[in-house]
Amino acid sequence: MELQNDLESLDNELNDFSEDPFRDDFITDEDAVRSGWRSAWTRMKYWFYKNRLKWTNNPIVIGDAKDSRDGSNFRRGIPLYELDANGQPIDTELVDENELSFGTGFHSKVPFKIIFRTLFGSLVFAIFLILMINIAKPHHSTRVLSHFGSPEFDPYVKYFNGTHEFFPLTIVISLDGFHPSLISKRNTPFLHDLYELKYDGGMNITSTPFMVPSFPTETFPNHWTLVTGQYPIHHGIVSNVFWDPDLNEEFHPGVLDPRIWNNNDTEPIWQTVQSAFDGDIPFKAATHMWPGSDVNYTKYNEEKLQPEHKNPIARERTPFYFDEFNAKEPLSQKLSKIIEYVDMSTLNERPQLILGYVPNVDAFGHKHGYPSESEYYYEDFTETLGEVDTFLKQLVESLQERNLTSFTNLVIVSDHGMSDIVVPSNVIIWEDLLDEKLRKDYVSHAYLEGPMMAISLKDSGNINEVYHNLKTSIDEDKYTVYVNGNFPKEWNFNDGKNHHMASIWIVPEPGYAVMKKEQLKKVAKGDHKDKNEDNVFTIGSHGYDNNAIDMRSVFIGMGPYFPQGYIEPFQNTEIYNLLCDICGVAEKDRNSNDGTGMLMNQLREPQSSEEVEIEDDFDYLVSKFGEFSTYNIIWGGYPEETEQDNVDNDNDDNDDGNTDEIAAMPSSSLTIKLEMTTSIPSATETLLGETSPSSRSSSSSSIQASATASTVGDWLQDIINDAKDLIDDIIDSIDDLVDSDT
């Protein structure tokens, strides 16, 4: 009886799996797809073993007796009287020969039933298993499915917009110099609706009061941080301007020397996605004026400039498509270029990741700061804000017109804010801070890093002398002198190994700046209609403490990946991992970075604006941005601007006619022929025309997946459930047939 008890115990333990082998409480990590597949497979095995025991161990009696599920003749396996005390078979010569026919012959209908059920069930299960394995095989080695919005969004499947197949699109737009408090119902109505989560466009929206940039809060360091996930001290672009002593070369905007850009072991997002999916999905990235994306590494490899201890630079380090910087480009042309990428007519040529850079607000801010309503340049400033807002609105409308929003995610960010500087009142002159002889004897290079000064010395042994001379020459309430390696810990800027770092830095408080005499003269000659009788005027700058109010940046995510709600402020080093996640890049294929996972954790539980508690200097924010700033309304408790308060400033009247034309333009009018590195037909087909695009992905299926179709994960789960039900139904049917026959 011991063996029978053991088998019954096992049967009881597995019993629950028979009803629902895929129940949710069996999966403990709902965000780990690899664990999910493993758990699903484990459930399937348990379910199969459970039912196989039932198939092979139904109650049997010898000879012509009938089986009974609760009768006294219920037996399992070898008859117990054939075993000795140790469980070993005994001599069967004394046993009736008819009894030995148990389960071995076909003279009884009952054994035939058992054998048929076992073989047929096993066959069906084997077919199902092969199907499951083929379907479950991901496009890439390890899949990531951690979307937080629509359960129908899957980065690995193809969608259909009604005319063409698409892989999911991810578009990143960076608004240089755009502070989140610039958003208002009056000046940026579209961004206002996004920021308040009230945009009625059928897309989920996630936002945050502000995103924290990296120090120094300058354009090139922060744009490289956004796409690498690394602090500037780690990725090596430590400022907009610096000296590279190894190359004996100065870096500044416009320098495209690959030896500087590839100096550290960094990997921008376009390299990550193009490498991770190489050979599986024809994943391509396109960048439009993104800082650092137009570096040509071909010459670097051909001339063997790469150090011997490093491998040649991968071709994926350059985006498949990239556009060089053009400061004079109108926003209508920028929109046209982005839509050209979207409108490419085949999967093989269309990029799945597009990054665009919008410099307009930053360019204005450097000239005049952020003018308040009573200041001279306010109307010009609001016009600039309105143009940027309209650009974003028409970009989203272009996606909607093309029926792309159910599988397109848009990420809107900025790199930093802006601080107003009253000139010359709040400026100190570099030449007045250090004796001319000391500058000549000790200083090799002195660069203006925005409002800061970075000083490289000829001999590190002179650091203390120069440091103390500077400290005695400045107002330490407004300016702080730092020796490299002694920056505040929260800046994440201490690393003695980075050779791009200057020896000594002078960092002002927001609203103050260090300038050279020559620079001050140049600035004073600019167009400053706000200059008073004392020749005092306002400019703007950035580069300060990244936690300063003036330096805050924007983050808004919209699309099927995102949930609806707010998240707490976070560091911009999280954006790289966010983009990897949206695109479906597994963690093992991501480059090492400084992201903490904080953003991903928050996306799991978005909050309301009331739940995101913000303690802030709202008096200062009102004085700088006005009480009707959307930020002040949401988190400062200030009243909404009423129609009476609001001067009619409808941005539709300010729309660029060309931009309107492009947004409404059918994609058939946007065709492009580009030089490709692979054999791809030219884009002469129009997106809305009659075409028969072929599938070129590594998935064997050419079936068009509609934009509202279930994801691969949901589809597979349905197949598993259906197969399980099918097997159960077949077995029950066989039971009924055999029972009726007997």
Curated annotation (Swiss-Prot):
Its main location: membrane. GO terms for cellular component: membrane. Residues 1-113 are cytoplasmic. It is a single-pass type II membrane protein. Residues 640-659 have a biased composition (Acidic residues). It is found in: Membrane. Glycans are attached at N161, N204, N264, N296, N403. It catalyses: Hydrolytically removes 5'-nucleotides successively from the 3'-hydroxy termini of 3'-hydroxy-terminated oligonucleotides; a ribonucleoside 5'-triphosphate + H2O = a ribonucleoside 5'-phosphate + diphosphate + H(+); a 2'-deoxyribonucleoside 5'-triphosphate + H2O = a 2'-deoxyribonucleoside 5'-phosphate + diphosphate + H(+). Residues 691-711 have a biased composition (Low complexity). InterPro entries: Alkaline_phosphatase_core_sf, Phosphodiest/P_Trfase. It is an enzyme of class 3 (hydrolase). Keywords: Glycoprotein, Hydrolase, Membrane, Multifunctional enzyme, Phosphoprotein, Signal-anchor, Transmembrane, Transmembrane helix. Its EC number is 3.1.4.1, 3.6.1.9. Residues 168-545 are annotated as: Phosphodiesterase. GO terms for biological process: cellular response to phosphate starvation; nucleoside triphosphate metabolic process. Residues 640-670, 686-711 are annotated as: Disordered. One of its GO terms (molecular function) is phosphodiesterase I activity. The active site is at T219 (nucleophile). Autophosphorylated as part of the catalytic cycle of phosphodiesterase/pyrophosphatase activity. Induction: Up-regulated during phosphate starvation. Residues 135-742 are extracellular. PANTHER family: BIS(5'-ADENOSYL)-TRIPHOSPHATASE, ECTONUCLEOTIDE PYROPHOSPHATASE/PHOSPHODIESTERASE. Present with 3420 molecules/cell in log phase SD medium. Belongs to the nucleotide pyrophosphatase/phosphodiesterase family. Mediates extracellular nucleotide derived phosphate hydrolysis along with NPP2 and PHO5. This is Ectonucleotide pyrophosphatase/phosphodiesterase 1. It comes from Saccharomyces cerevisiae (strain ATCC 204508 / S288c) (Baker's yeast). The lineage of its organism: Eukaryota, Fungi, Dikarya, Ascomycota, Saccharomycotina. The gene is NPP1.
